[in-house]
């Protein structure tokens, strides 16, 4: 449930926690009815920001929300915290709620720009800009650091890491060599593919190697 659910005390929106929990529990029950062993994950962004998670999951606990795993996104481009801080966040949250945790999204630039020269979705990371440059080696070294930190989460409560997006590589448009035929979606207005904003953060280069 998520991808991702955003909520903290600063978000100005109507609060219907009871309705939200009914929705979550209905989804949980539906999943278990079909596949009892499947895990239900509630996914928030800003992994490493404990205050957002405690605000949200405290409210869910009060109302008896049912779920198995806490999911979190962690992108250095949008975080002030490094991989070690992400590990400590995992320790804190998993212990507080007695739940396994999973990093549902992460990513890092291996090239400063997309193939067309424009910036992609993930810009320079303030926390890593002087440590890991936007190169293939910098990309690999960041991922190695993150994996090693999360492997050391207490009691193996971090189940793993999902990379976003590993394979949405640049697919050249023969009619426009700077354009990519891969992207988030096809626009209804002109049947053209939307911009591929992650082609410089994949696990492959622009040529799929």
Predicted regions and their residues:
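Short, well-ordered beta-to-alpha junction loops that form the rim of enzyme active sites
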Residues: 1, 44-46, 106, 163-166
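Active-site cleft segment of glycoside hydrolase catalytic domains centered on the general acid/base Glu
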Residues: 1-65, 80-88, 176-184, 190
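Glycine-centered small-residue hotspots that permit tight backbone geometry or close packing
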Residues: 1-2, 71, 160
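Aromatic-rich peripheral "rim/lid" segments of glycoside hydrolase catalytic domains that contact
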Residues: 9-12, 88, 92-95, 111-145, ...
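The substrate-binding groove and active-site-proximal loops of carbohydrate-active enzymes
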Residues: 13-19, 46, 73-80, 128-138
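A structural signal for short coil/turn segments at secondary-structure junctions
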Residues: 35, 64, 97, 154-156
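Aromatic- and acid-rich polysaccharide-binding/catalytic face
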Residues: 42-44, 53-84, 88-92, 96-122
């Amino acid at each position: 449930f998520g991808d991702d659910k955003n909520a903290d005390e600063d978000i100005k929106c109507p609060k219907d926690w009871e309705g939200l929990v009914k929705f979550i529990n209905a989804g949980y029950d539906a999943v278990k009815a079909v596949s009892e062993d499947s895990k239900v994950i509630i996914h928030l962004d800003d992994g490493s920001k404990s205050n957002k998670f405690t605000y949200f999951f405290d409210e869910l606990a009060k109302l008896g929300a049912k779920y198995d795993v806490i999911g979190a996104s962690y992108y250095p481009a949008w975080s002030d915290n490094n991989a070690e801080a992400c590990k400590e966040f995992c320790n804190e949250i998993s212990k507080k709620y007695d739940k396994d945790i999973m990093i549902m999204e992460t990513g890092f630039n291996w090239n400063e720009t997309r193939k067309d020269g424009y910036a992609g979705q993930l810009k320079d990371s303030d926390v890593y800009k002087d440590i890991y440059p936007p190169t293939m080696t910098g990309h690999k070294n960041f991922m190695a650091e993150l994996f090693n930190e999360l492997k050391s989460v207490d009691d193996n409560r971090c189940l793993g890491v999902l990379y976003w997006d590993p394979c949405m590589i640049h697919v050249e448009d023969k009619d426009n060599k700077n354009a990519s035929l891969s992207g988030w979606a096809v626009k209804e207005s002109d049947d053209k593919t939307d911009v591929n904003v992650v082609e410089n953060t994949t696990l492959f280069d622009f040529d799929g190697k």
